[in-house]
Amino acid sequence: TASWRNTLVGEYVAVGAAGQRQPQGPGIEVVDSAIPEWTSTFALDWRHGSWSAAWVMRHISELREDCGNAVAYPVCSNPATGTNVLPATSYHDFQVGYRFDDFKGLQLVLGVNNAFDKDPPICLSCSLNGYDASTYDIPGGRFFYVRANLRF
C-alpha cells in the first residue's frame, strides 16, 4: 500500500497583540518557528502472511531567514541580501514487524526513524543550539525502537 500526503501553505498572516503584522509566513524561519511552504509524507507499507514492513519519507521544503549578525560569516548562504537558506530536508524511517500466530494478537515491531542520521540545517535565527526543534528532527537524531502490540 502506498500513500502520499502533502501540505501546501499558500498564505499565513500572524498579527501581534498590538495589531501589527508579524514577519512570519510560508517558507520563512523566524525565532525558532517555521512554517514550511511544503511538507510531504510518502509511505509504503507491505504485508505478507505474518510479516510487515514499512518505509516512510518525510520531506520539508527549504526555508529562508535573516542572517542577522552572522551576515559577515561563511555560514550565511547569501550575505549580499542578508538571507540564509535552510535547504530542503528529507528523513527516512523504516520498520519491520512480525505477528505471532501462537499468541493471537501479539506483534513485535523493530524500527528506525531518521535512518540515515540526517542532521537538521543550521539555523542562524534559532536560539536552541542553531536548529529549529519544532520543524526538524534533533541533531544525531537516528532513533531505534522496539514495539510490542497486543490486541485482545
Identify the meaning behind each predicted range.
Residues 36-40, 88-92, 140-144:
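Residues that define the transmembrane beta-barrel architecture of outer-membrane proteins
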Residues 25-31, 72-73, 78-84, 131-136:
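Extracellular loop and loop/strand-boundary signature of outer-membrane beta-barrel proteins
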Residues 8, 95-100:
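Short, well-ordered turn and helix-capping elements at secondary-structure junctions
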Residues 1-67:
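Gram-negative outer-membrane beta-barrel transporters
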Residues 54-93:
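Extracytoplasmic gating/loop element in the C-terminal half of outer-membrane beta-barrel translocons
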Residues 42, 53, 94-96, 146-148:
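Membrane-embedded beta-strands of outer-membrane beta-barrel proteins
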Residues 13, 58-69, 98-152:
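C-terminal beta-signal and adjacent terminal beta-strands/loops
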